[in-house]
């Protein structure tokens, strides 16, 4: 499957398209984003032994996160968390409207297929990392595997070795920036590190070899993205990539109707083929999805329920990815009389999960047509990003996007750039 990427850093999000359909929406978080690293402070009054957890103060603005003691690294002779202590921690679950961020002290950096973990690196190496070469990093990884591990994803057997080398370079790039900032710490608690490059979160979801074109909002960002790809990815030398840029972010939104995409993504009702529609309702406890046949009819009435559920399953998987729904999800399918139809639906649903790379755990399909499943929450859902308690208030997002200064896109840049041999920068009027 091939993808096209639209990166609009001015508006704080990027989108992943496949065959003219939006697959992912990736938001840039101002604070407590996924994989952000802090030097956190644990006050005495924030330790709760009965809960076996504590609340950690993350920065000078008194933002807090929740950390279970099982995810907190303690010294070998230490049984309890010492009050007023400081830990290097990382965000593994972003905060929602009513829940704080979930933290861990097992620090890691990741790319699409590689996961770099380090929890016990000796301090004598700290002065080496900012200026060390990539091969030296690999050597130290082999010499001290207990302190620095690189874990390979199970799908790496299908990945080109040049892709793995490129991802290793990106890990080294992030690794060096992290330790450079660690050496400059002057006060605690304090925010330490975030992947400031807006392109890196995309590489955590996709392989670069599956991307065709990039769309950015200015020539300067196109040049920066080209420099990043050539510097940190070896595969760029063998593959042609196009980077298309527009005069402003609003011009991109206007061409691709992104405002209407967000508006639709927050509406509870999603229409599919043949009049079938699904209704998505998000509450604090769970997410319910109701399948309705609508005006759909079939010549064979006994196959109507199964056919309706199969069509709705495709839209359900797409909406789970697009809206980033997580937690407990209950799907109310149209009732099916025959057990063979239920087995057919489950097999088809598992097939959709595999081809769409959605990490979902199926629990059971009850006799009344309720499919129970769970999905681990990491990023915020689209509702949490815009802090909409009631999803019917989708006009808030619509007004927010349209409030962008429409006069910006009138800037005329009378240029047509086609630069370099492997990465082409193309201006779109």
Curated annotation (Swiss-Prot):
It is found in: Plastid, Chloroplast stroma. GO terms for biological process: mRNA processing; rRNA processing. Keywords: Chloroplast, Endonuclease, Hydrolase, Magnesium, Metal-binding, mRNA processing, Nuclease, Plastid, RNA-binding. It is an enzyme of class 3 (hydrolase). Mg(2+) binds at residues 290, 332. The keyword Magnesium applies. Its EC number is 3.1.26.-. GO terms for molecular function: endonuclease activity; metal ion binding; RNA binding; RNA nuclease activity. Coiled coil: none annotated. Its cofactor is Mg(2+). The keyword Cell membrane does not apply. Binds 1 Mg(2+) ion per subunit. One of its GO terms (cellular component) is chloroplast stroma. Its main location: plastid. PANTHER family: RIBONUCLEASE, RIBONUCLEASE G. Involved in intercistronic processing of primary transcripts from chloroplast operons. The endonucleolytic activity of the enzyme depends on the number of phosphates at the 5' end, is inhibited by structured RNA, and preferentially cleaves A/U-rich sequences. Belongs to the RNase E/G family. This is Ribonuclease E/G-like protein.
